[in-house]
């Protein structure tokens, strides 16, 4: 649907909501002292999750003059030799801002130039109206340096069921799954069946 294709055997991890996916991705990628760029306003758990794994959160405030979209200039100004990960969420909560393909292509150039990894929280992707949602992971050379997070809470109004999806390179998903299996084991069976019904129902 969003031009993303992953091997379900080793490139997809089912999590207890996208929130667990955020935590797992950060813990798999971030070493103590690494800087993580966080686009704000942001989901409440982003910065605490960065801090819990020893990372240093660096805020990138979105500007109304840019329609709350992240620009390549804003991103470039925050990058240092310690920067490792860019954490973004578009469509954004609470601004509702979306990143169009041209916006993401400009961000892609900066990410590649500085060898960054991207965690992209796309939980609101299904709530994009009037235009097709574009994932930065679908752009050339970005597949191998992105973890895409999504879930069922927003698209299917299943907040309490705690069902999330993390998709990315097999090596990263492998390390995320190692943490997942010793902390959570698995998402609830009943929730998985409910999610399957949501995905396959003709309604």
Features from the language model and the residues they span:
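Phosphate-binding glycine-rich loop
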Residues: 1-35
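Conserved core segment of the aminotransferase class I/II
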Residues: 139, 144-203
């Amino acid at each position: 649907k969003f031009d993303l294709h992953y091997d379900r055997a080793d490139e997809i991890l089912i999590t207890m909501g996208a929130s667990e996916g955020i935590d797992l991705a950060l813990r798999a990628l971030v070493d103590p002292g690494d800087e993580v760029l966080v686009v704000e306003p942001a989901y409440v758990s982003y910065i605490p999750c960065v801090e819990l794994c020893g990372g240093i959160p660096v805020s990138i405030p979105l500007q109304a003059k840019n329609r709350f979209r992240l620009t390549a200039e804003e991103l470039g100004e925050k990058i240092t030799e310690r920067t490792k990960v860019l954490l973004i969420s578009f469509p954004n909560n609470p601004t509702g801002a979306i990143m169009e393909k041209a916006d993401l292509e400009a961000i892609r150039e900066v990410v590649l130039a500085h060898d960054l990894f991207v965690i992209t929280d796309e939980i609101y992707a299904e709530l994009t109206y009037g235009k097709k949602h574009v994932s930065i992971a679908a752009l050339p050379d970005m597949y191998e340096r992105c973890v895409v997070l999504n879930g069922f809470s927003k698209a299917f109004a299943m907040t309490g069921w705690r069902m999330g999806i993390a998709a990315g390179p097999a090596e990263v998903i492998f390390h995320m799954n190692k943490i997942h299996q010793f902390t959570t084991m698995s998402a609830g069976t009943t929730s998985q069946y409910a999610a399957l019904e949501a995905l396959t129902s003709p309604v």
